[in-house]
């Protein structure tokens, strides 16, 4: 469960980074 949350967080961060760029 924790791994899933971490993955979701990393995915959202990547999306945010891509949107920022």
From Swiss-Prot:
Keywords, comma-separated and alphabetical: Acetylation, Activator, Cytoplasm, Electron transport, Nucleus, Redox-active center, Secreted, Transcription, Transcription regulation, Transport
According to the UniProt record, one GO cellular component term is:
nucleus
> Where N6-acetyllysine occurs along the chain?
3
Major location, coarse class?
nucleus
Q: Name one GO biological process term.
A: response to radiation
Source domain of life is Eukaryota
What residues bear N6-succinyllysine in this entry? 8
Cell compartments where the protein resides: Nucleus; Cytoplasm; Secreted
Q: How does it assemble?
A: Homodimer; disulfide-linked. Interacts with TXNIP through the redox-active site. Interacts with MAP3K5 and CASP3. Interacts with APEX1; the interaction stimulates the FOS/JUN AP-1 DNA-binding activity in a redox-dependent manner.
Q: What does the similarity note say? A: Belongs to the thioredoxin family.
What does this chain do? Answer: Participates in various redox reactions through the reversible oxidation of its active center dithiol to a disulfide and catalyzes dithiol-disulfide exchange reactions. Plays a role in the reversible S-nitrosylation of cysteine residues in target proteins, and thereby contributes to the response to intracellular nitric oxide. Nitrosylates the active site Cys of CASP3 in response to nitric oxide (NO), and thereby inhibits caspase-3 activity.
* Name of the protein: Thioredoxin
Name the gene behind this protein: TXN
